Amino acid sequence: MAQDPRVEMLTAYCSFPDAKLYRDPEHLNKGVFDLPMLDGYEWRRVANYSPSPRLGRFYGLINPGVIKLVAGYDCCVVYGHAYISFWMAICAAKLLGKPVLLGTDATYIDPHNGGRAWKASAKKMLFPFLYNRVADLVLVPSTASKRFLCSLGVREERIALTPYVVDNAYIAGIAAGADRKKTREEWQVPDDGVVVIFCAKFLPRKRPQDALRAFARAKVENSYLMMVGDGPLADSLREEVARLGIADRVRFTGLVKYSRLAEFYAASDVLVFTSEHEPYGLPVNEAMICGIPAIVSDRVGAGYDLVDTGRTGFVYPCGDVDALATILSQVLPDRELLKRMGEQSRARMKTWSPRENADATIRAVEKAMGKEQSAKG
């Protein structure tokens, strides 16, 4: 988007990867993202003055420098509202009379919310006010998010769908040059085997145990399951594999550098993504770009836009291991079906790319500013 002549933009970072910030399992994979993230666009690191810097806490980011940055541009886009710094930017823009676009990937409100039911009730009241009254427009990454906001009373005309994307060209390039046979030799998996890949943190909300149990119940000959990731459930998952009697067909790879991840997808045949709380789910994008279909739970936001049943994958009820096992037992033996779905998956991603994201975002900014011309923001 930074190369688009319609906009002059600055990205402000209120935090950078730091051990002091990442103190929970949700951020255990930050060290494996080994691609340059600061090239090709103008950005600024804003000093954080929080006495207790930490992600996931409202006062973990206190960056008053955002106020001056907002003052220098025509429009302000804020992705989220969970930190005091974000509210500084929002309030500065409103006081200065500048359009404010807010971004959210929320797809539902957890009624339990870590044992704090009052937060769920508060959000049901906050979201309509925030997105109907405070924001000029709301940016969402998926149809799932759009439907959720509409269900809370946010007006549809105030919502702009800006596709959640990865670097399609980079991933496709790695996949095209990948040596499938060599990667499988590394895994100790036969070249004629059918491979299911699970790629996520081993956290309760990701439900990795469902992938193991469904794979075991499917009982497909010459099939293998790659568990790519790590996390608090790692030991219990290995114990589960032994209990299920599938240790000879399951591989745990640990965390994988992002620069190699496309090789892993390219050497696989289908992605399984079992999360119960996944506002979007970028592994679905990554897998489909590499030419493999995705089987996802109905709590994965990406499923609404990318998974076309029988063409680019399947959607099953979250937690229904039998339903997932049935899909695996039907799909894994059918190599022609997997190949065809893989080709359709790759084709689908040609219209869900950074180009579509940039176009949608710029259109939203122009709409918020009430004009169809170049914008500085």
Regions found by a protein language model. Give the residues of each.
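Nucleotide-sugar donor phosphate/pyrophosphate-binding loop at the beta->alpha transition
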Residues: 99-101, 108-134, 145
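Conserved donor-binding/catalytic core segment of Leloir-type glycosyltransferases
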Residues: 190-206, 212-215
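Short alpha-helical donor nucleotide-sugar binding micro-motif in glycosyltransferases
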Residues: 255-256, 263-268
